[in-house]
């Protein structure tokens, strides 16, 4: 099972020679090569992007990838309707607060996390199990933050997009949709809104306690 997947380091893909070595060590002539969607991705301990930009070509390619990705996202945002943009603002606000208020907790969990091998589907299965057992907003906001952090540290953009697409479907269940639409609705009573905000963020405390038990729950 996946252990502490939502923390730590760079995901790297299995090199072709790794697969070839595995095949050569297997006496069975019917060896089946892994399908691309089932490829195993490994966390590496390095989080310094300079470790992956060793040549001038690496730097130039990264610049091109950044430009294309930024243009795509900027264009996407311009096309979003007003309602969707308001949801973007809400998610920005709440996830940023989770990141800021519980930064030390995240660092502790990153230190606790061990190097593991897994697929995007392993990640999705673990997240789905956690969300089925926790109906609160906090756990969903924190999951978004964790998956986003994985994406930041992933050197495989194709796998990152796949992970974001799959996990967004899993995270956006009926509970999360109800929470976001409730928060976005106008409130006549500012005090009520503040209390609701604090109540919702308080759930994040329980959420972190849940995640901290994962290393004991998931073998």
Curated annotation (Swiss-Prot):
Q: Report the coiled-coil segments.
A: none
Task: Please give the superkingdom of this protein's source.
Answer: Viruses
What InterPro entries does the record tag this protein with? Answer: Bcl-2-like_sf, Orthopox_F1, Poxvirus_F1/C10
* Keyword Membrane in record: yes
Question: Gene3D superfamilies, from UniProt?
Answer: Blc2-like
Give the UniProt keywords, A-Z: Early protein, Host cytoplasm, Host membrane, Host mitochondrion, Host mitochondrion outer membrane, Membrane
As for subcellular location, the record says: Host mitochondrion outer membrane; Host cytoplasm
| Covalent S-S links between cysteines | none
Q: Its Gene Ontology biological processes?
A: regulation of apoptotic process; symbiont-mediated suppression of host apoptosis
Q: What induces it?
A: Expressed in the early phase of the viral replicative cycle.
A Pfam family annotated for this UniProt entry: M11L
This protein's GO cellular component annotations are: host cell mitochondrial outer membrane; membrane
Q: How does it assemble?
A: Homodimer. Interacts with host pro-apoptotic protein BCL2L11 (via BH3 domain). Interacts with host NLRP1. Interacts with host BAK.
Q: What does this protein do?
A: Plays a role in evading host innate immune response by inhibiting host inflammasome activation. Interacts with and inhibits NLR-mediated interleukin-1 beta/IL1B production in infected cells. At the host mitochondria outer membrane, interacts with the BH3 domain of host BAK and prevents BAK from binding active BAX. In turn, host apoptosis is inhibited.
What is the similarity comment for this entry?
Answer: Belongs to the orthopoxvirus OPG045 family.
Q: What is this protein called?
A: Apoptosis regulator OPG045
């Amino acid at each position: 099972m996946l252990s502490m997947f939502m923390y730590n380091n760079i995901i790297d893909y299995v090199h072709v020679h790794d697969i070839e070595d595995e095949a050569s060590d297997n006496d069975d002539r019917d060896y089946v090569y892994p399908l691309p969607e089932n490829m195993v991705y490994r966390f590496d301990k390095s989080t310094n992007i300079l470790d992956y930009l060793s040549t001038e070509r690496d730097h130039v390619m990264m610049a091109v990838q950044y430009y294309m990705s930024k243009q795509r996202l900027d264009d996407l945002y311009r096309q979003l309707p007003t309602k969707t943009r308001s949801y973007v603002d809400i998610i920005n606000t709440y996830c940023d607060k989770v990141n800021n208020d519980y930064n030390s907790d995240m660092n502790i969990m990153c230190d606790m996390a061990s190097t593991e091998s897994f697929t995007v589907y392993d990640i999705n299965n673990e997240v789905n199990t956690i969300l089925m057992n926790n109906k609160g907003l906090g756990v969903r906001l924190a999951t978004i933050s964790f998956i986003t952090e994985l994406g930041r540290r992933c050197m495989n953009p194709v796998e990152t997009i796949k992970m974001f697409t799959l996990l967004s479907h899993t995270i956006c269940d009926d509970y999360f949709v109800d929470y976001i639409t409730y928060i976005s609705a106008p409130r006549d009573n500012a005090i009520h809104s503040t209390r609701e905000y604090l109540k919702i963020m308080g759930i994040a405390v329980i959420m972190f306690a849940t995640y901290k038990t994962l290393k004991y729950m998931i073998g």
